[in-house]
Amino acid sequence: LRSADAGDNWNRVGIGQGIHSDAVIRCLAVHPDKPNFIYAGCDKGIYTSDDAGATWSLSENPLNDYTVWSLAIDGQDPDLMYAGTGTPTPTVCFRSRDGGSTWEKTSMEAAAECPAVGTPRVTGIAIDPTDAKSIWVGIEVDGLRHTADGGDTWTTIDYSDIPNMDIHNVAVSAGPPKTVVVVVNHDVYTSTDNGTTWKSIGVREGFDLGYPRGIKVQPGSPNVIFLTLGDTTPGSTGCIMRSKDTGRNWERLPLPVEPNTAMW
């Protein structure tokens, strides 16, 4: 869907605008220096638009054989991108060094099968804004991965540190303090020591709704983090929570209408 009037009205982007009628869009990413240039990951690869979503074209590259669930662009070097794939296609973290023109597989490994979803899927990729070689990848349902060398080698975060393999999303705030935020099924974990230790924020105990999905750091205000939740999936209601202190305290934001589904 696309709105050209700040969200008052919405229209479906269809085949007339270049997107195949049965394409299932899983993620969006906006070029940090060219706000009209948008990437859309889907079950056919990656579509791109250079006119703020009015028209689209399908990029021809190896990702055409994969379902793309997540995208990340380095804010300092937009030519550096990562794409995560999965269900029903293999789980891979791809890397591009030329703005998405070409892609290569990184060495990240994932389980072939996992509970609930079958083939795991990369549901979140976060590039550390203070160190572009540090990337965090969340996999549903196969845990959290981290690379300190731009994707050449990877480590798996121990299950005892984050006792939930069902990763929904991940973000990194520059802080201070620099904070890694990991969204899991029914909770959120934060780390201020680059993943050495983790702390639960207690979603079930402290929030009205207990099914978190989306996480976003506000550009230009790294201590401000937004979290989207629902009652379940697909759910019957949702909300947006905001933290102004890098995840220590949260407030529910008012919405103009009551959502009828979980917010992703």
Name every feature range the model reports, one short phrase each.
Residues 1-264:
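Extracellular glycan-interacting surfaces
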